Amino acid sequence: QFIPALAAELKKKGVYEDSIFHISDEPHDYCLEAYKYAHNLLRPLLSDAKFMDALSDYSFFEQGLVDIPATYTAAMDDFIGKDVKEQWVYYAEDRSGISIRLMAAPPYRNRSLGIQLYKYDIKGFLHWGFNFYNTSLSFHKVNPYLTTSAGKTMASGGNFSVYPGAHGALLSPRALVFYEGLQDLAACRLLEKYVGREEAIRII
C-alpha cells in the first residue's frame, strides 16, 4: 500500500519524474537473489520510475536490475566503455590514486574529479557523506567541529563536506575545492563547443 500511495503523492506534487528510487547500497553477488526479489517486488509498482543504486558490480547492471549505476570511482574500470547511458560516480573513503576529498588528501586529488567527469562523460555525482554527523551505523551523534572521523570509524572528512551552521550548511575548504572541480568541468564543456569533444579530450 505504501509504495503506490507514495508514487501518487509524488505525482500530485509534480516531482515524480525527478524522483529516483533506491533498493540497496552496493549489492554484490552474494546477495543477488535477495536483490532480485526486492527488484521484482518494486518494479511492477514503479514501472515508469528510475532506479539508482551505488553499484560497483557490473553484472547487476548487465542483467537489467539497475537503471542508473552510481559506481565507486575505484571500480570504474569495469564500467568504462560499456553501454551505460546514465553513468554516475561517487567516492567514499580513501583509495590510493583516485579522486577523493578527505582532509588528509592534497587538494588536487579533490579537484581532479571535474576533469574525470568530463573525460568519461559522467552524468552525475552521488554525494556520499555530504552531512553525516554520526558514528558508523548512526549509533551516536557527533560534533563535526570536534570529531571529523565519525567517532574514529571513518577517515577524517569522508563522512561530511559541509558543517552545520546557524542558518544552514557552511562549506568546508574541501567543498570549495570540489566546486572548483565542477568549474573545470564547465570549462571543458565550453571548450568542447569551440573545438569539439575529441580535441578537448586531446588537450586534457
State where each predicted segment sits.
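Catalytic domains of carbohydrate-active enzymes that cleave complex glycans
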Residues: 1-32, 41-56, 138-204
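Catalytic-core regions of glycoside hydrolase
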Residues: 1-138
